[in-house]
């Protein structure tokens, strides 16, 4: 902890939140704001993962898809929120969830996503649409699909999550949820400054920043 002795506050993002050093930091008296990870005693800022998955799955459903696969990321508060939202939204839509279509993967692992996509494509009754944990994974899935001579979205539809610029520049443009990372960073920084300057009046809360659905062209409109 000596490395943080002279700092006024710490913004934590894109780390292994289970790391002992991170846990020790969280339990210290240093003002801390975490991004996309919720601790009981710390202020957290994240995108609205519940609404994001709800909007994404609802759009896919409205395009006529009923066999929807979801490759989700490693265990975390973000993943838990997304999975619960997936099940809840499916129930509200009256869409049956095939448990074989829900597969655990990892965030930002394109190669891993390729292998999991292959597993889904090899199923006797394969899904008509695959949702990936992020856009990088969607790109990996896209590679596997194209390597088999299949077309997106004519043969199979895909959707990502993040809204990174490259997925909006390729054809077909990837359907995804745009996360306003700049806004998330700004809100996190503002809250950290408040924690440092006004510790007695700063609330320990979970601040949520909404994202937006980018419809793209990677989800096919199914024929009735």
Across the structure, where does each feature detected by a protein language model lie?
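Central regulatory/effector-binding core of bacterial HTH transcription factors
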Residues: 1-18
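Bacterial carbohydrate/catabolite-sensing allosteric modules
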Residues: 9, 20, 24-224
């Amino acid at each position: 902890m000596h490395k943080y002795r002279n700092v006024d506050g710490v913004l934590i993002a894109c780390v292994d939140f289970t790391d002992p050093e991170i846990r020790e930091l969280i339990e210290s008296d240093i003002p801390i704001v975490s991004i996309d990870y919720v601790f009981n005693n710390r202020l957290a800022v994240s995108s609205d993962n519940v609404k994001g998955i709800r909007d994404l799955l609802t759009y896919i459903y409205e395009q006529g898809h009923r066999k929807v696969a979801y490759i989700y990321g490693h265990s975390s508060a973000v993943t838990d929120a997304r999975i619960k939202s997936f099940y809840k939204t499916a129930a509200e839509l009256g869409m049956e969830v095939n448990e074989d279509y829900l597969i655990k993967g990892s965030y930002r692992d394109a190669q891993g996503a390729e292998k999991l996509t292959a597993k889904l494509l090899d199923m006797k009754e394969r899904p008509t649409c695959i949702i990936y944990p992020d856009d990088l994974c969607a790109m990996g899935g896209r590679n596997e699909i194209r390597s088999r001579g299949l077309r997106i979205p004519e043969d199979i539809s895909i959707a990502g999550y993040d809204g990174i610029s490259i997925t909006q520049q390729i054809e077909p443009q990837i359907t995804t949820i745009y996360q306003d990372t700049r806004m998330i960073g700004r809100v996190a920084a503002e809250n950290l400054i408040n924690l440092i300057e006004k510790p007695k009046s700063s609330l320990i809360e979970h601040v949520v920043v909404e994202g937006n659905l980018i419809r793209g062209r990677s989800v096919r409109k199914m024929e009735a």
